[in-house]
Amino acid sequence: MTMSRREVLGVAAAALLARRARGAPPPGGGTMRTRPIPRTGEELPVIGMGTWRTFDVEGASEKERLREVLRRLFEAGGRVIDSSPMYGRAEQTVGELLGPSPRPFLATKVWTSGRDEGIAQMRRSMKLMWPKGGAFDLMQIHNLVDWRTHVRTLREWKDAGTIRYWGITHYTSGAFDEMEQIVKKEKPDFVQIPYSVGVREAEDRLLPACADARVAVLVERPFEAGSLLRDVMHRPLPSWAAEIDCTSWAQILLKWILGHPAVTCPIPATSNPEHMADDVRAGSGRLPDEAFRRRIVAELTGGNR
């Protein structure tokens, strides 16, 4: 019988309630770990949230559901929220739903060509996501669009205190060679890349380059748009999951990513509060070492590169 993620979570929740009734602590402990931004030492919670597709909404009922997603993220100690003007209404939705506290760590992107066009787009994005104003946390160059132009603006803005950090992003591994050169020569504060059990090319050179250059790494598409979860949902959770304090496949996939020391924060996207509550549990408890990570890859891919 194939179980949906909702059904799997229901079984896990029932088991968790039983453990609590017996007085045993839940696996993972409940306190989200943090990792430092290498350039400054500022600590970031290790599970954040993306907004591609999920926050591009208009209806009141949809927004209330997303408000609960944010509540689950913050309740667990998460703070990182990533968006882009490419994502439709997502930036505006985030700005509308955020309350006065806790203070999030907000990231968005510039996704246009030209200095003046980039400045106008970034100002609009910052106002949409954080109407309260003040220094914006992280501005990234989306998919390296006109990056040489925007790097100059972002450095000026960082020096002026308009933004706190700047970075680069791309959604395909085909851009990793260029990103590696930018990391080495331009020294961004952040990169955002795809990295997962199924997409591991970043391990070859880009992640080591980020570690050497003291660049923080945000990981997009940790579930490969859900395909990795669909591939495993029919399988029972393996007994070894308990060795890294996991109660779901989603947690295993996220902890596999966090097992790489160069990774700062995966940013799974969801519009389902139950899925967010599940994902954030990967932010606490034991992480897999390198041997355990190889075991996970072998389990899920048959050992294929």
Segments the model singles out, each with a brief description of its role:
Residues 2-104:
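N-terminal binding-site loop/beta-alpha segment at the start of enzyme catalytic domains
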Residues 56-58, 84-92, 112-118, 142-148, ...:
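Acidic-and-aromatic substrate-binding clefts and catalytic sites of carbohydrate-active enzymes
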Residues 37, 49, 81, 94, ...:
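Conserved, mostly hydrophobic/aromatic
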Residues 60-73, 115-130, 174-181:
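Short, acidic/polar
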Residues 38-41, 94-102, 125-132, 156-158, ...:
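Acidic (Asp/Glu)-rich catalytic clusters
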Residues 130-146:
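Active-site groove signature of glycoside hydrolases
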Residues 142-305:
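Beta/alpha (TIM)-barrel catalytic core signal, keyed to glycine-rich beta->alpha loops juxtaposed to Asp/Glu
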Residues 44-46, 77-79, 102-104, 134-137, ...:
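Short, well-ordered coil/turn segments that N-cap beta-strands
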